[in-house]
């Protein structure tokens, strides 16, 4: 099955194939192409060229995945992280992100092919058309320096608010 929308700015196309216990969804647009295969909990039932799904959760997963893919191929997903702390620095060396976040050694990780990284001072801007890849990479970076609830330092999302705990009263 194929669905497409053509306007001057937004152009996208969705193709999907329903097999017995899986659905393959392919979305393409101006930003790129995303392909994903979903496993169904119950087999799909076909009657007069109409597919029925027994499990309500399966249909919600398919609709949610299509929404994410449409948004990804039209605009993409952007996540901004900030390094809060004295002397916290981030560098991009080739295809590797190197973080100096207060340990005796540097923390480094490979940047996935689908994710574009831009550094502005102490901010890390991650961009991709695949929401799953960019959020997974952002959560990986956040694990390198967890938030200190007493000082408010660590790797934070740009809109993340922290309620500081009280220290010891002497």
UniProtKB/Swiss-Prot annotation:
<dbReference type="InterPro" id="IPR000702">
    <property type="entry name" value="Ribosomal_uL6-like"/>
</dbReference>
<comment type="similarity">
    <text>Belongs to the universal ribosomal protein uL6 family.</text>
</comment>
<dbReference type="GO" id="GO:0005762">
    <property type="term" value="C:mitochondrial large ribosomal subunit"/>
</dbReference>
<keyword id="KW-0689">Ribosomal protein</keyword>
<protein>
    <recommendedName>
        <fullName>Large ribosomal subunit protein uL6m</fullName>
    </recommendedName>
</protein>
<dbReference type="Pfam" id="PF00347">
    <property type="entry name" value="Ribosomal_L6"/>
</dbReference>
<dbReference type="GO" id="GO:0019843">
    <property type="term" value="F:rRNA binding"/>
</dbReference>
<dbReference type="GO" id="GO:0006412">
    <property type="term" value="P:translation"/>
</dbReference>
<keyword id="KW-0687">Ribonucleoprotein</keyword>
<keyword id="KW-0496">Mitochondrion</keyword>
<dbReference type="InterPro" id="IPR019906">
    <property type="entry name" value="Ribosomal_uL6_bac-type"/>
</dbReference>
<dbReference type="InterPro" id="IPR020040">
    <property type="entry name" value="Ribosomal_uL6_a/b-dom"/>
</dbReference>
<dbReference type="InterPro" id="IPR036789">
    <property type="entry name" value="Ribosomal_uL6-like_a/b-dom_sf"/>
</dbReference>
<dbReference type="GO" id="GO:0003735">
    <property type="term" value="F:structural constituent of ribosome"/>
</dbReference>
């Amino acid at each position: 099955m194929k669905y497409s929308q053509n306007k001057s700015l937004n152009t996208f196309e969705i193709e999907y194939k329903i097999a017995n216990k899986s659905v393959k969804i392919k979305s393409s647009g101006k930003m790129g192409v995303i392909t994903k295969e979903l496993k169904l909990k119950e087999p799909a039932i076909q009657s007069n060229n109409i597919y029925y799904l027994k499990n309500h959760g399966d249909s919600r997963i398919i609709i949610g995945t299509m929404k994410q893919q449409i948004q990804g191929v039209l605009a993409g997903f952007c996540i901004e992280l900030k390094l809060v702390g004295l002397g916290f620095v981030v560098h991009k060396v080739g295809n590797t992100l190197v973080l100096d976040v207060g340990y005796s050694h540097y923390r480094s990780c490979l940047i996935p092919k689908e994710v574009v990284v831009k550094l502005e001072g102490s901010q890390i801007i991650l961009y991709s058309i695949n929401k799953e890849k960019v959020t997974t990479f952002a959560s990986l970076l956040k694990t390198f320096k967890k938030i200190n609830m007493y000082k408010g330092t660590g790797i934070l999302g740009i809109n993340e608010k922290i309620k500081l705990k009280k220290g010891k009263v002497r």
